[in-house]
Structure formats: structure tokens, C-alpha cells
Amino acid sequence: MLYDVISKRALSVLEVKNETIERYRQEVAALQERGVVIQSIICDGKSGLLGSFLDIPVQMCQFHQIKIIVRHLTRKPKSPATQALRALSLTLTETTQAAFEAALKRWYEQYAAFLNERSVNEKTGHSHYTHKRLRAAYNSLKRHLPWLFTCERFPELCIPNTTNLLEGKFSGMKQLLRCHRGLKKGSKLRFIKDYFAKNSS
């Protein structure tokens, strides 16, 4: 699904077996060939997608980044380090890039020793990082930082910092689909395309 936040209409609705980076590239290229001017892209941070459009500003949805952190650290983390990183991630939608990067740097300086703790497997003698989920959360933030505040660097484009507009459309569609559980696959796809055609406003 490719959706225009300015006109609030679906530009492309496709059924695909696998969501691939190449498919996204093809769809964006097809839109450009039709004369559609793509000022920016807001996406959920699918691996490999963020760096795929070098000539188009790409914003990663900040709410999706928060979800990634919560998935790694859970909603009720126990250690001070995980609690602090989760709390920091929750500020993403209301902070600036400079403030967030400074806070993340302070977090690392405070908890680097904990983050880098290693444990030894008594059977094999091999060591591994003790706090793997915390490292995954921290590395996710570091890896995605170049795209989390694109909206701030291009104020003239008024880029949304989340995909909430599209998520809201999906939510309404799913509610209607639940009322039509008996639809066959082909009918369901037509229903989805028709839904976005009628709800493009």
C-alpha cells in the first residue's frame, strides 16, 4: 500500500506474497513514471527500506520505533537500564533530534558497562552478551537514528513523523472486514481496493 498524505488517497494497492524492498522500489518508480511527484516517504522501518531511496527524504515512523523498543524490553522492564531506555524511547514523538541523541548518549555513558556485560556458557566455554534484548533495543535506535527525525530536517515538506494516518485507515477497513468474514480471497481484495477508493478524502 502506497498512500498520499496530502490528497489522502491510496496511490497503489497490491496483493503480494512477500513484502520485498524491490517491490517497493518498483512501485515508487511506477508512480514517478506516471508523473507523481514524491516529496518524501514515511515507512515503518522494514529492514533495508530506509536506505533504498537516496534521492527522496525518508522518515521512519516514530511509533513503529517505539513498538520495536517495547517488544524488546517489554512493558514492565526490571533493570534500571532497560527502564531508562524504554522511558527515553517514549519521548521520540515529542522531542528533537539533538535532544534525543544527547539523551541517548548520556544513557549509554551511564549504562555501557551493564550493556556490554558478558556471560560464559559453562558447557562450551564461549561467552555471549548477557543482556541481548537490551542490546537489540539500543542497536535498533542507533541504526534508525538517521531516519527518525527526517521530518525535522525538511520542515518545508511538512513530513508526518508517523504513519498514523494510514494506520487509521487500516483500522477502519479491518473493522468492516470482520463483518464480512465469509468473503473469498478475490472478493476480499476487491473489497479492500473499493474501501480505499471510497475513503480517499
Annotate each predicted stretch with a short phrase.
Residues R9, L49, I69, G172-M173:
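Hydrophobic positions within alpha-helical membrane elements
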Residues E19, S79, H180-G182:
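A short hydrophobic/aromatic micro-motif that marks alpha-helical segments and, especially, helix-coil
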Residues S40-R86:
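Conserved beta-strand -> loop -> alpha-helix junction used to position metal-binding or nucleic-acid-contacting
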Residues M1-S40, S47, G51, D55, ...:
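RNase H-like nuclease fold core
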Residues E33-S47, F53, R86-S201:
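Acidic/histidine-rich catalytic cores and adjacent linkers
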